[in-house]
Amino acid sequence: MEGIFAAYVLPALIIALKSVVLLVVLLIVVAYLLYADRKIWAAVQLRRGPNVVGPWGLFQAFADLLKFVFKEPIIPSGANKGVFLLAPFVSAVLAMATWAVIPVNEGWAIANINVGILYIFAISSLEVYGVIMGGWASNSKYPFLGALRSAAQMVSYEVSIGFVIVTVLLTVGSLNLTDIVLSQNTGLGTMLGLPASFLDWNWLALFPMFVIFFISALAETNRPPFDLVEAESELVAGHMIEYSSTPFLLFFLGEYVAITLMCALMTTLFLGGWLPPVDVWFLNWVPGIIWFMLKLCFCFFLFAMVKAFVPRYRYDQLMRLGWKVFLPISLFMVVATATFLKVFGLA
């Protein structure tokens, strides 16, 4: 009996505990990233932003949470009730499930699997189903149009993201996210005879792919300037028009968890994960999770600034950028990277 407990029950309990801790921390981080998003947007528009609930408005996100929870969920009379209520859960659960393999520090991942990046790509590809289900089940034309746009948009830019990931895999030789981070201890800077620093990270050696990944991540998460799924001037709120109360909150949560995931992926694939920017003794004392969070916040700041400054693309411009610009460039970079590694014996 003790052998069964040690072999099966105890590992399951540890994984469950890790999952609960990750979920709580992730929700708190998302709440304050939402607060930061609103503050940055307000600063650009010369406003104060959230400033009522708590000091400097720090508890505004939690007040909004309570407001949504205590509202009455209204289901349209012509809606498919089961699918209508299931869609937000699908969106939120899939967004949070991808975090199981993200290493926020060395050894700090719920599941340090050897196909981690493939797992993320597979699960994140399914998130579009929550949007499609919500748009279809609402039995309204505007949510349905938003869902159709979302399907086309997310599929279009997943192709470019896939080629970006392939390029990183070619340079690293592993699908394990921890290996991808550790491989950035040495890189282009070391080859040029420089001390270990942020110049070794993949953002410099694969800079075109870094830019493509960043812009594709904006489109994949329906962020401005690619927020055509919920374009206020056309579709009001897209697939979320008919949603209120907790179902709307779950859709909103899934969207921001997906944004945070893309920031974490940028940090892991291109910005050295938990590695310090310069290999000096006093920076090595700082816990790796601090560096990871600082880089994640920097990526989110870029997302927020794009939202504040860049006007929305037209739908035809969005599709043209994905298929006629990013796809050829990313495919060329995959071939060029593979050729370079083969010619110089680095494969």
From Swiss-Prot:
GO biological process, one term: aerobic respiration
Membrane topology per record: Multi-pass membrane protein
Record's catalysed reaction(s): a quinone + NADH + 5 H(+)(in) = a quinol + NAD(+) + 4 H(+)(out)
Top-tier EC class: translocase
Cellular component, GO annotation: plasma membrane
Spans traversing the lipid bilayer: 13-33, 50-70, 82-102, 115-135, 161-181, 198-218, 246-266, 286-306, 325-345
Record's keyword terms, sorted: Cell inner membrane, Cell membrane, Membrane, NAD, Quinone, Translocase, Transmembrane, Transmembrane helix, Ubiquinone
Localization per Swiss-Prot or TrEMBL: Cell inner membrane
Gene Ontology molecular function terms on file: NADH dehydrogenase activity; oxidoreductase activity, acting on NAD(P)H, quinone or similar compound as acceptor; quinone binding
InterPro entries: NADH_UbQ_OxRdtase_su1/FPO (IPR001694), NADH_UbQ_OxRdtase_su1_CS (IPR018086)
E.C. no: 7.1.1.-
Protein family according to the UniProt entry: Belongs to the complex I subunit 1 family.
UniProt subunit comment: NDH-1 is composed of 14 different subunits. Subunits NuoA, H, J, K, L, M, N constitute the membrane sector of the complex.
UniProt function note: NDH-1 shuttles electrons from NADH, via FMN and iron-sulfur (Fe-S) centers, to quinones in the respiratory chain. The immediate electron acceptor for the enzyme in this species is believed to be ubiquinone. Couples the redox reaction to proton translocation (for every two electrons transferred, four hydrogen ions are translocated across the cytoplasmic membrane), and thus conserves the redox energy in a proton gradient. This subunit may bind ubiquinone.
Protein name: NADH-quinone oxidoreductase subunit H
Organism this protein belongs to: Brucella anthropi (strain ATCC 49188 / DSM 6882 / CCUG 24695 / JCM 21032 / LMG 3331 / NBRC 15819 / NCTC 12168 / Alc 37)
Gene that encodes it: nuoH
